[in-house]
UniProtKB/Swiss-Prot annotation:
GO MF annotation, one: metal ion binding
GO cellular component terms listed in the entry, alphabetical order: actin cytoskeleton; plasma membrane
SUPFAM superfamilies documented for this protein: Glucocorticoid receptor-like (DNA-binding domain) (SSF57716)
Gene that this sequence comes from: PLIM2B
Pfam families: LIM (PF00412)
Protein origin, superkingdom: Eukaryota
Positions of the UniProt region annotated as Disordered: 171-201
Gene3D superfamilies per record: Cysteine Rich Protein
Protein name, UniProt field: LIM domain-containing protein PLIM2b
Signal peptide feature range: none
UniProt organism field: Oryza sativa subsp. japonica
Subunit structure: Interacts with NEK3.
Length: 201
């Protein structure tokens, strides 16, 4: 019995497709080298193509043609041939989840990426930067206190600002932008009075 080959014809070039070079997308046969974007002629892969009415596009041109322009005429506007310089557009929610972030840590002012991000009171922090500014204690969402954007653990906050069981003085300090209480130097004990009964020899 002899091998008769395949009867499949490539949809793009209408030539016979041999099994070794066969690529089938949506039940349609193509040569691997004919599986190209109809706009930019870039070679496509099974995970990087889209098609509309049997016309193949790379993901970029499919989005540009159908999603952004809203046109289903399969024609690009004159002068709109895309190159490496893509149109400036806001990334989709899915795309932005993988493309990074513009959020800056309120403590160190460096970029905060989603895996290390902690957001409290509208501010973003690195998990490692979310610590007490007085003692450096690592904070949790249930163990922190903040005054004018400065983070404290509840223990140090109480030690620094609590007076006689009330936080009323905090309103005054907050209004005057005073964050830490005034530091009063410890008084040195007074030298003992000279002993009058002592005689110098």
């Amino acid at each position: 019995m002899s091998f008769t080959g395949t009867q499949d014809k490539c949809t793009a070039c209408d030539k016979t497709v041999h099994f070794i070079d066969l690529l089938t997308a949506d039940g349609v046969p193509y040569h691997k080298t004919c599986f190209k974007c109809s706009h930019c002629k870039g070679i496509l892969s099974m995970c990087s193509y889209s098609s509309m009415d049997g016309v193949l596009y790379c993901k970029t041109h499919f989005e540009q043609l159908f999603k952004e322009t809203g046109s289903f005429s399969k024609k690009f506007a004159p002068g709109c041939r895309s190159t490496d310089k893509e149109l400036a557009r806001a990334p989709s929610k899915i795309c932005s989840a993988f493309s990074g972030t513009q959020d800056k840590c309120a403590a160190c002012q460096k970029t905060v990426y989603p895996l290390e991000k902690l957001t409290l009171e509208g501010e973003s922090y690195h998990k490692s930067c979310f610590k007490c500014s007085h003692g450096g204690c690592i904070l949790t969402t249930s163990s922190y206190a903040a005054l004018n954007g400065v983070l404290y653990c509840k223990i140090h906050f109480g030690q620094l600002f609590m007076e006689k069981g009330s936080y009323n003085h905090m309103k005054k300090k907050s209004e005057s932008q005073e964050v830490l209480p005034e530091v009063v130097p410890e008084e040195q004990p007074a030298p003992p009075p000279p002993d009058e009964n002592r005689e110098d020899n």
